From Swiss-Prot:
GO terms for molecular function: glutamate-1-semialdehyde 2,1-aminomutase activity; pyridoxal phosphate binding; transaminase activity. This is Glutamate-1-semialdehyde 2,1-aminomutase. It is an enzyme of class 5 (isomerase). GO terms for biological process: protoporphyrinogen IX biosynthetic process. The gene is hemL.
Length: 417
């Protein structure tokens, strides 16, 4: 039972969990026994419709048969070589085919490693030391980005983590999202190595870029000689095969990827312009290495996933599911609210009229959102326990799943709002 496991977990894990957002489910997290398609099955034998999907990677749904088949085959042939493999070349070739900025690729093991490497690359390439990021953008759990961070950092009240030296934090400057005036002021005043941004904010709920924001970043970074980094760990291969940069028509210098490109297995990647990527060791002097970089299991799962995405049906199904549910939620909420959706992921904010940056998102009625989450969970629908995460849909969220979910959302939201 989940309650028994929670009691044991608190004795062996800090805070009882291995990633803080998992502790946001109250009174204690449920524990998952298995998952298939759009559903989770808990240790308490409850079947839940899942709109978390591992926080984004599972765009095909849980336990997709093509991914299972590919990974089983790879397991029979070994799962770690310490040498290059055919699979890593194939997956990188898929990425360079579809992602506009990706002339070369370096695989790592997480989104955190990807952004850490991208920032190091921007510093090595430009010879500058300072970074510009945006309030509420989350780029992983390393020192240079845990400053005004979103996601669980904001949920648990620590957007500035303890343990980061001032010598590090002093090299990171922050602007509000969607604020080009601030960006230009900083770029004029400081020697900025890299500007890192979530092209769609996915870690303060969902907040889309305003029309001129991404093109403006592209123009300003070129003008002032800074490296533009799109953190597409969430949006990469979610908003289409080319990610946010294709969706919005703006090509950065570097892109970080993760989540979907590993098919639900641990992965990260940095890709971008040849002259920047070639600064990485062994061709350059910006160091990166890893025992599990490009491990065959993640490579194989990623290939199988992208092969399914290339058929386009997954995008059609997942976009329709998100659109229908976002519209149903919008109709059902009676109080002031915002529903922000970009293609196949979305979030709703209660008690506010406009959400265009992190400060706006923080004004939403988070306590009421938690009550909605708890009521939905009782009715068999699992959404993120944090206001500052996103709801994701997949190719497994078919009409039957959408119709049942819409019924539950309508019932809960009309009752609570």
């Amino acid at each position: 039972m989940s309650s028994d496991l929670w009691n044991k977990a608190q004795a062996v894990f800090a805070g009882g969990v291995n990633s803080p957002v998992r502790a946001a489910v109250k009174p204690f997290p449920f524990y998952t026994r298995s998952a298939k398609g759009a559903y989770l099955v808990t240790e308490d034998s409850r079947r839940l419709i899942d709109f978390v999907l591992g926080y984004g990677p599972l765009i095909l749904g849980h336990a997709h048969p093509k991914v299972i088949e590919a990974v089983k085959d790879q397991l029979e042939r070994g799962w770690l070589y310490g040498t290059p493999s055919r699979a890593e070349v194939e997956l990188a070739s898929m990425i360079t085919k579809h992602v506009p900025s990706a002339q070369k690729v370096r695989f790592v093991n997480s989104g955190t490693e990807a952004t850490m490497t991208a920032l190091r690359l921007s510093r090595g390439f430009t010879g500058r030391s300072k970074i510009l990021k945006f309030d509420g953008n989350y780029h992983g759990a390393h020192d240079y980005v845990l400053i005004d961070a979103g996601s669980a950092a904001s949920e648990f009240g620590v957007p500035f983590s303890q343990g980061i030296p001032t010598e590090v934090s002093s090299t990171v400057l922050v602007c509000p999202y969607n604020d080009l005036t601030c960006v230009e002021t900083v770029l004029k005043r400081e020697e900025i190595a890299g500007v890192i941004v979530e092209p769609v904010m996915g870690n303060m709920g969902v907040i889309p870029p305003e029309k001129d924001f991404l093109p403006g970043l592209r123009k300003l970074t070129r003008e002032y000689g800074s490296v533009l980094i799109f953190d597409e760990v969430i949006t990469g291969f979610r908003l289409g095969l080319g990610g946010a940069q294709s969706y919005f028509g703006v090509t950065p210098d570097l892109t970080t990827l993760g989540k979907i490109i590993g098919g639900g297995f641990p992965i990260g990647a940095v890709c971008g312009r040849k002259e920047i990527m070639d600064q990485l060791t062994p061709s350059g002097r910006v160091f990166n290495a890893g025992t599990f970089n490009a491990n065959p299991i993640s490579m194989t799962a990623g290939i199988a996933t992208i092969q399914e995405l290339e058929k386009k049906e997954v995008y059609t199904v997942s976009e329709r599911a998100a659109r229908v549910l976002a519209e149903e939620i919008d109709r059902a909420i009676k109080m002031d609210h915002v529903v922000n959706r970009v293609y196949n992921f979305f979030q709703f904010f209660l008690g506010v009229k406009d959400v265009r940056n992190a400060n706006d998102a923080r004004k939403a009625k988070r306590d009421l959102y938690v009550k909605v989450h708890e009521s939905l969970l009782k009715e068999g629908v699992f959404i993120p326990p944090s206001q500052f995460e996103a709801l994701f849909t997949s190719g497994a969220h078919d009409d039957d799943v959408v119709n049942e979910s819409a019924r539950v959302f309508k019932k809960v939201l009309e009752d609570l709002t």
